[in-house]
């Protein structure tokens, strides 16, 4: 789960808690509306929108039955999750997406691998940047498994003339970069409350399969934000995300 930073910083005050699937739903809205005269639409559209929406669905079981962090008396924030469970969700998300379509599995697996490897060096919005020494072997085993998965899925996609183009490195990385943009843009809203969000930018947003650009976001007040260059098909694009306030358990 994602615990939004408390506006008043009070340890015992209610905190806004967002399921990973609710975060994914916001990512999916961005993906569905991505593309205009400047930005190429996702290709293959359905599969890319699906994996961006479902990229964290390895957390489904934990979303419905979360473990409590004894330090906060709330569900574990995603990065505070016990390491074995964190690694398990990094496998389960590609498992889920592979069942949707092999291409969904490939992009999801790239996302899992990238989270532990600086998002392939393509983003400064890095979340998993430190895993304790005692968990390195377990983490590396999971990551090696994802590389094996990617090789298997690329081979399967290449065997089908209808999907071989999708698996080309430039195309796969353009779609991976689109997932990173939608993910980090959603986290921009999920992690901090209205009134505390600051101007920032997102690097390596794909304009097409060969060209990337940095997209800046600036709060304008009244829950309104400007993006430059603007990447969506609706202007303005109206979105929302769900969550709930939880009081720390006694």
Where do the protein language model's features map onto the residues?
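An active-site-proximal "capping" alpha-helix that borders the catalytic cofactor pocket
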Residues: 21-35
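Divalent metal-dependent catalytic cores for phosphoryl transfer on phosphate-bearing substrates
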Residues: 6-18, 28-29, 47-162, 166-196, ...
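Short, conserved alpha-helical segments within structured domains
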Residues: 23, 44-49
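Short pre-active-site segment immediately N-terminal to the catalytic Zn-binding motif
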Residues: 32-46
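Long intrinsically disordered, low-complexity, acidic S/T/P-rich regions
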Residues: 1-4
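Extended, charged low-complexity segments
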Residues: 179-250
């Amino acid at each position: 789960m994602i615990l939004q930073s408390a506006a008043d910083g009070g340890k015992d005050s209610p905190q806004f808690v967002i399921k990973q699937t609710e975060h994914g739903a916001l990512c999916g809205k961005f993906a569905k509306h991505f593309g205009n005269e400047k930005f190429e639409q996702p290709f293959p559209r359905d599969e890319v929108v699906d994996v961006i929406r479902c990229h964290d669905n390895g957390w489904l079981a934990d979303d419905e039955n979360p473990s409590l962090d004894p330090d906060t008396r709330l569900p574990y924030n995603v990065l505070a999750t016990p390491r074995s469970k964190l690694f398990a969700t990094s496998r389960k998300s590609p498992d889920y997406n592979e069942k949707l379509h092999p291409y969904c599995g490939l992009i999801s697996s790239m996302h899992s691998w990238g989270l532990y490897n600086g998002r392939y060096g393509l983003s400064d919005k890095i979340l998993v940047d430190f895993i304790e020494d005692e968990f390195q072997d377990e983490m590396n085993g999971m990551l090696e498994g994802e590389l094996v998965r990617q090789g298997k899925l690329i081979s399967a996609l290449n065997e089908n003339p209808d999907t071989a183009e999708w698996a080309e490195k430039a195309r796969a990385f353009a779609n991976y970069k689109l997932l990173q943009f939608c993910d980090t843009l959603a986290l921009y809203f999920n992690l901090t409350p209205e009134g505390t969000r600051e101007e920032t930018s997102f690097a390596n947003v794909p304009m097409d399969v060969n060209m990337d650009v940095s997209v800046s976001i600036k709060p304008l007040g009244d829950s309104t934000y400007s993006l430059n260059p603007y990447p969506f098909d609706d202007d303005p694009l109206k979105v929302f995300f769900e969550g709930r306030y939880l009081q720390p358990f006694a």
